[in-house]
Amino acid sequence: MQTLFTKSRKRDIVLALFLTVFIICLAVIITVFFKQLYYFDIDYLKIAESTGLSREVIQKNYDVLIQYQSIFYQGSLNLPDFVMSNTGRIHFEEVKRVFEMIQITFVVTGIISAVM
Protein backbone atom coordinates (compact mmCIF):
# COMPACT_ATOMS: atom_id res chain seq x y z
CA MET A 1 0.00 0.00 0.00
CA GLN A 2 2.82 2.38 0.81
CA THR A 3 4.39 1.74 -2.63
CA LEU A 4 1.18 2.83 -4.39
CA PHE A 5 1.02 5.97 -2.29
CA THR A 6 4.63 6.80 -3.12
CA LYS A 7 4.15 6.26 -6.87
CA SER A 8 0.97 8.30 -6.81
CA ARG A 9 2.67 11.08 -4.87
CA LYS A 10 5.62 11.17 -7.27
CA ARG A 11 3.22 11.30 -10.21
CA ASP A 12 1.34 14.20 -8.61
CA ILE A 13 4.57 16.12 -8.04
CA VAL A 14 5.73 15.56 -11.63
CA LEU A 15 2.30 16.57 -12.94
CA ALA A 16 2.36 19.71 -10.79
CA LEU A 17 5.79 20.63 -12.19
CA PHE A 18 4.66 20.11 -15.78
CA LEU A 19 1.49 22.12 -15.18
CA THR A 20 3.49 24.92 -13.56
CA VAL A 21 5.83 25.15 -16.55
CA PHE A 22 2.83 24.93 -18.89
CA ILE A 23 1.08 27.84 -17.13
CA ILE A 24 4.23 29.98 -17.09
CA CYS A 25 4.73 29.37 -20.82
CA LEU A 26 1.06 30.17 -21.46
CA ALA A 27 1.40 33.47 -19.58
CA VAL A 28 4.46 34.43 -21.64
CA ILE A 29 2.78 33.46 -24.91
CA ILE A 30 -0.38 35.41 -24.12
CA THR A 31 1.61 38.46 -23.07
CA VAL A 32 3.83 38.42 -26.16
CA PHE A 33 1.20 37.60 -28.76
CA PHE A 34 -1.71 39.63 -27.35
CA LYS A 35 -1.30 42.55 -29.75
CA GLN A 36 -4.19 44.54 -28.29
CA LEU A 37 -2.16 45.09 -25.11
CA TYR A 38 0.59 46.81 -27.07
CA TYR A 39 -1.94 48.72 -29.18
CA PHE A 40 -3.41 50.05 -25.94
CA ASP A 41 0.07 50.99 -24.72
CA ILE A 42 0.78 52.99 -27.88
CA ASP A 43 -1.86 55.46 -26.74
CA TYR A 44 -1.59 55.02 -22.98
CA LEU A 45 2.19 55.47 -22.90
CA LYS A 46 2.08 58.09 -25.67
CA ILE A 47 4.60 56.14 -27.74
CA ALA A 48 3.62 57.88 -30.98
CA GLU A 49 4.11 61.31 -29.43
CA SER A 50 7.43 60.44 -27.81
CA THR A 51 8.89 58.84 -30.96
CA GLY A 52 7.43 61.12 -33.61
CA LEU A 53 6.09 58.09 -35.49
CA SER A 54 2.46 57.59 -36.38
CA ARG A 55 0.39 55.01 -34.56
CA GLU A 56 -0.05 53.15 -37.86
CA VAL A 57 3.71 52.90 -38.48
CA ILE A 58 4.38 51.68 -34.93
CA GLN A 59 1.57 49.14 -35.11
CA LYS A 60 2.58 47.85 -38.57
CA ASN A 61 6.19 47.28 -37.51
CA TYR A 62 5.12 45.72 -34.22
CA ASP A 63 2.85 43.30 -36.09
CA VAL A 64 5.78 42.25 -38.31
CA LEU A 65 7.99 41.75 -35.25
CA ILE A 66 5.39 39.65 -33.42
CA GLN A 67 4.70 37.54 -36.50
CA TYR A 68 8.46 36.91 -36.76
CA GLN A 69 8.49 35.59 -33.16
CA SER A 70 6.02 32.81 -33.98
CA ILE A 71 7.33 29.29 -34.26
CA PHE A 72 5.40 28.99 -37.53
CA TYR A 73 7.21 31.90 -39.22
CA GLN A 74 10.43 30.78 -40.92
CA GLY A 75 11.46 33.90 -42.89
CA SER A 76 13.81 36.70 -41.96
CA LEU A 77 12.83 39.80 -40.04
CA ASN A 78 12.33 42.81 -42.30
CA LEU A 79 10.76 45.78 -40.57
CA PRO A 80 9.07 47.94 -43.22
CA ASP A 81 9.98 51.32 -41.71
CA PHE A 82 13.21 50.72 -39.79
CA VAL A 83 16.78 49.94 -40.69
CA MET A 84 18.32 47.23 -38.55
CA SER A 85 21.98 46.86 -37.62
CA ASN A 86 23.68 43.48 -37.76
CA THR A 87 23.78 43.30 -33.95
CA GLY A 88 20.06 44.19 -33.87
CA ARG A 89 19.33 41.37 -36.30
CA ILE A 90 21.36 38.94 -34.16
CA HIS A 91 19.46 40.10 -31.07
CA PHE A 92 16.07 39.44 -32.67
CA GLU A 93 17.23 36.03 -33.93
CA GLU A 94 18.24 35.12 -30.37
CA VAL A 95 14.93 36.38 -28.98
CA LYS A 96 13.09 34.35 -31.63
CA ARG A 97 14.92 31.20 -30.49
CA VAL A 98 13.93 31.89 -26.88
CA PHE A 99 10.26 32.37 -27.85
CA GLU A 100 10.36 29.25 -30.03
CA MET A 101 11.64 27.23 -27.07
CA ILE A 102 8.87 28.65 -24.89
CA GLN A 103 6.26 27.70 -27.52
CA ILE A 104 7.68 24.18 -27.89
CA THR A 105 7.84 23.76 -24.11
CA PHE A 106 4.22 24.94 -23.89
CA VAL A 107 3.05 22.28 -26.36
CA VAL A 108 5.15 19.47 -24.86
CA THR A 109 4.20 20.17 -21.24
CA GLY A 110 0.56 20.56 -22.27
CA ILE A 111 0.53 17.17 -23.98
CA ILE A 112 2.37 15.46 -21.14
CA SER A 113 0.04 17.02 -18.56
CA ALA A 114 -3.01 15.93 -20.54
CA VAL A 115 -1.93 12.29 -20.77
CA MET A 116 -0.77 11.99 -17.16
Please identify what each model-predicted range represents.
Residues 30, 64, 68, 95:
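Residues that form generic nucleotide/phosphate-binding pockets
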Residues 20-23, 103-116:
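Transmembrane alpha-helical segments in integral membrane proteins
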Residues 32-51:
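Alpha-helical transmembrane signal-anchor/signal-peptide segments
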Residues 1-38:
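Hydrophobic secretory-pathway targeting helix
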Residues 71-109:
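Individual transmembrane alpha-helix segments
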Residues 52-71:
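Short extracytoplasmic
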